Amino acid sequence: MNGFFLVNKPEKMTSHDVVFQIKKKFHFDKVGHTGTLDPLASGLLIICVGKATKLAFLFDKLPKTYQGTFLFNKHYDTLDVTGKLLDTKNTPLTDCNIQKSFASFHQKKYLQIPPMFSAVKIKGKKMYRLARKNQVVDIPPREVFIHHFEKTSLFCRDQVDFLAHVSKGTYIRSLARDLALQLNTYGALLRLQRTAIGTHLLQNAKTIENLELNDLILDSTFFAAYDELILNDYLIKLVKNGTHLDQRQITTKKPFIVKDSNKNFVAYYDTLDENKYYPRYFF
């Protein structure tokens, strides 16, 4: 079977733990995920099964939505409360100035520096491994976009709740740090829940315990809304051998599905160049 599960990951469990448990529960040979969710965080994790593990790239560019809680005036090495507390401040804060800081990031594109404790690679080495060895490196910033950033509670006991809808590659831990910097203090992540990946919603996800085999979204079902190209038997043989297609078969700027004359799914094609297309996945 090839497809996807929408899983509600609990706190204190790694994304790898979820993969392992699903593999064990259903006796699948190949299982993967489309993007790590930190152990501190709960919420939506998309799990790929079978050949669909090769489709993780489809989710990479999707925006993500989170809700959670920031903690101010405390500095942790990991930028969340699971790390080592390095320093504290007693900076007086108000709802008014916190709201102004939130507003300054709303619908904003900016260069964000990922946390040192992250899976980002520097010269082929994951930064969290360097951090554990106390190795200091220059971390290149990456451009991110904050589509929506909202304070959802009153400030109380150095804490405030938030809602964030962000682009690919955005670290909420870094956002906590950067929000607090504008307030001349420290910021860390206290709680985090991922509620959406693109149009895939947490409300449609299940816990590992409640997950059933018929919850698997088949790869063919996932592509049901894509444009399709139906080819004859001769061209289908070429497609199965990895042949590129061009304007002689189709003209489009979007990915599409190739089907045979019986409307069976054969391959997923993506754009390579203008009027040139290549296969990225075979059903």
From Swiss-Prot:
<dbReference type="Pfam" id="PF01509">
    <property type="entry name" value="TruB_N"/>
</dbReference>
<comment type="similarity">
    <text>Belongs to the pseudouridine synthase TruB family. Type 1 subfamily.</text>
</comment>
<dbReference type="InterPro" id="IPR014780">
    <property type="entry name" value="tRNA_psdUridine_synth_TruB"/>
</dbReference>
<dbReference type="GO" id="GO:0160148">
    <property type="term" value="F:tRNA pseudouridine(55) synthase activity"/>
</dbReference>
<dbReference type="InterPro" id="IPR020103">
    <property type="entry name" value="PsdUridine_synth_cat_dom_sf"/>
</dbReference>
<dbReference type="GO" id="GO:0003723">
    <property type="term" value="F:RNA binding"/>
</dbReference>
<comment type="function">
    <text>Responsible for synthesis of pseudouridine from uracil-55 in the psi GC loop of transfer RNAs.</text>
</comment>
<keyword id="KW-0413">Isomerase</keyword>
<protein>
    <recommendedName>
        <fullName>tRNA pseudouridine synthase B</fullName>
        <ecNumber>5.4.99.25</ecNumber>
    </recommendedName>
</protein>
<keyword id="KW-0819">tRNA processing</keyword>
<dbReference type="GO" id="GO:1990481">
    <property type="term" value="P:mRNA pseudouridine synthesis"/>
</dbReference>
<dbReference type="InterPro" id="IPR002501">
    <property type="entry name" value="PsdUridine_synth_N"/>
</dbReference>
<feature type="active site" description="Nucleophile">
    <location>
        <position position="38"/>
    </location>
</feature>
<dbReference type="GO" id="GO:0031119">
    <property type="term" value="P:tRNA pseudouridine synthesis"/>
</dbReference>
